[in-house]
């Protein structure tokens, strides 16, 4: 319903709830459970009576690492767990609470951030609101302002002057003067407007820097000729280069953008292109390339903008519907160890500087209309949609020329100043994303789901959806804003399910201020914690140089938080949380924080990264489910490192055997993480009491030893063979296989085992990149796979093959050749060691 950062998938928390809350069979019931004949995989767990009633106790008892799938069969069922309480002390966007509530649990959520509280509040209220009331309120706002707002985003239809088209996106470029010759320089990185569509999908729309015309070209990296004025240029080469420099085409001077601003210049802005959508042409049956495309701005387009800017300047009543405070100095608003962007160096001072005048006029007009809705519950839903649309209504939003769409601000959890940006249609039209009407529709879809919740699941590799569940997305819930270390809470929760702060977590206070400063305009009179100018900073548990909090402070505060959780959790309760996989320092700090507050870490399970995380440097973000339980008796006796290592090795080995005997297929790295969890379970029973050579080992040292113990020596060869086993291996498969190993995807690419340019593919011995690697590698550095591929290359020449084979033949190579023949159906491998 609204942007929140690092959200875990709902399916992740549903799975966590399924395996966490179903502990006491007497509390569990399944609504509308199908007869066993309809679900053969569960028939063995029936009581055997004529009603085929499910024996939930037997089902729960059947689950272990070898047979984890029994409970999984209940994933798409309407499972209810009676008399169960769940706490999330770091609720964020509320996903954990919503999923626990679907199981019938009574849930309590806490978050320091008012935006998180407001978003989660409306998510729970979605099942309580009458959709007709929402529709009536929207129609009131639509009647009030939609015509005025849409009129300001219209342009003359390029194909028929008798009517107008809608502006989907208005594209702006900023400019500075050359500090030497004073020529005005538009700050383009290149002159590509957008990738071509439809019949022109192999071409690009480009802007002529001479006349401002827009035309199609075959290749932006080569000389292009403007179809309007004949100007010749290379569209890929704009004045702005890497490092934030801009070059003058007249005198050739290159100068830092931020230095020019520091010396007194300010950005000027110019409208350079419009993406339009003509509903009249579409309704008349025109081709898609006619009713949707790009055009140069006309005098009328400039006038529409100027009219809006004038109304904004002259309408004092609207000023109270836009934030006017100064942007706080912070770790992501100014340059710091967290972010290299410094918006102040680009001339930003107040929140209003993040929007152009037409945006300010339209957004304030829309918010004023929302404020007129009498019912505060309904008005808050409209405010939520308005707030979410702000991501795409600002001058940090960029136009994705390859995807022909707008990309919202804060995509990398920071404020990134743009030299060109996309202005969205505030109200919206038939095309485009992030408009008020599209975010409103997204909210209505969420409300509908809250009233009619379903679940999607895979069966026979096809996605299915259940019928609507009886339990709504609501139930008993309590949501509190405040510091979880201080707020008043009942104790004896059955489970704490959460996603706690990480060491290098998103600085939520700073990114959420972007929404908060708008939300508080309507909420400050109703909620005290929306009165301050910005969200709380000093109490956030995060490493933040702007508030003087380093890693040590973070670990101390996280430990206090776990201590508070221990106070609130029943002695037989369970703590389950998601955590980002990290190095020994990260895991060591976490284990110290847990064990120091009387928790025992009992298991770890890797999962895919959360919904918003991006992959960088070929390394995926691995999230781990961590399971811990309260310790009610004193921890174990002191132990030597050698004895602990033996215990941990046995436990890890047993875990691996159970996994390998199951029908699951985790990657080697994923298995290693589960083994690490078993090792840390053994250590948590002797926390702070492990001795080696007369000294007590610190936790980071122990974790590092365990990581070496479980990682083994996974080789690129093994990962390559695993990829060959797959029917259609992908880049994502490669990343998964490399999870928590000492191998990176780059290692395979460097060896020529995979290619990952425009498309991902598995290389063979015959690929040029593979042959180049083998030719450049010394004999003593060749792996068994390298040697087999060399033999396969020489198999066409009997003499060379005989010489190579006499030198290298081993049983390992013979077996590997047979395996490659099986995996690749290349019979050439079969004859490598036979005359």
Question: What are the language-model segments listed below?
Answer:
Residues 1-87, 101-492, 505-547, 561, ...:
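Nucleic-acid modification enzymes, centered on SAM-dependent nucleic-acid methyltransferases
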Residues 87-94:
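Class I SAM-dependent methyltransferase "Motif I" SAM/SAH-binding loop
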Residues 89, 110, 498-500:
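Conserved beta-strand/loop positions that form the S-adenosyl-L-methionine
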Residues 94-95, 506:
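Conserved SAM/SAH-binding loop-helix junction
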Residues 521-525, 564, 569-575:
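Short glycine-dipeptide loop
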Residues 555-571, 596-597:
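A short glycine-rich, Lys/Arg-flanked "PGG" loop and its adjoining helix->strand segment in the class I
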Residues 586-596:
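Conserved helicase motor "Helicase C" RecA-like lobe of SF1/SF2 P-loop NTPases
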